[in-house]
UniProtKB/Swiss-Prot annotation:
Designated name of the protein: Protein AC4
Residues lipid-modified (N-myristoyl glycine): 2
Function of the protein: Pathogenicity determinant. May act as a suppressor of RNA-mediated gene silencing, also known as post-transcriptional gene silencing (PTGS), a mechanism of plant viral defense that limits the accumulation of viral RNAs. May repress the AL61 promoter.
Impact noted for substituting residue 44 to P: Enhanced pathogenicity on N.benthamiana
Lineage: Viruses, Monodnaviria, Shotokuvirae, Cressdnaviricota, Repensiviricetes
């Protein structure tokens, strides 16, 4: 397994208690194999139940895309999810 690379984004609106936590973790494998897990958690109110959306992208083999291409797709997917809400 390669080195762990991780990123986390936190955002909140001024006029609401809603908080969005986005985090992505990926493990570059030997031979450019990539595993990416992306999680989004949305808490509407501090006392509300947690609503969680999990997106997982697993790429293996010679036809795998580059790390940059995969990260761009994950960022695009997270942006699309945020716009739908």
């Amino acid at each position: 397994m390669g080195n762990l690379t991780s990123t986390c984004l936190f955002s909140s609106r001024e006029n609401t208690a809603a908080k969005i936590n986005d985090s992505s973790t990926w493990y570059p494998q030997q031979g450019q194999h990539i595993s990416i897990q992306t999680f989004r958690e949305l808490n509407r109110l501090p006392t509300s139940r947690r609503t969680s959306t999990k997106t997982e992208i697993l790429l293996y083999g010679e036809n795998s895309r580059s790390t940059v291409e995969v990260l761009e797709e994950v960022a695009k997917h997270l942006t699309t999810l945020q716009q739908r809400r």
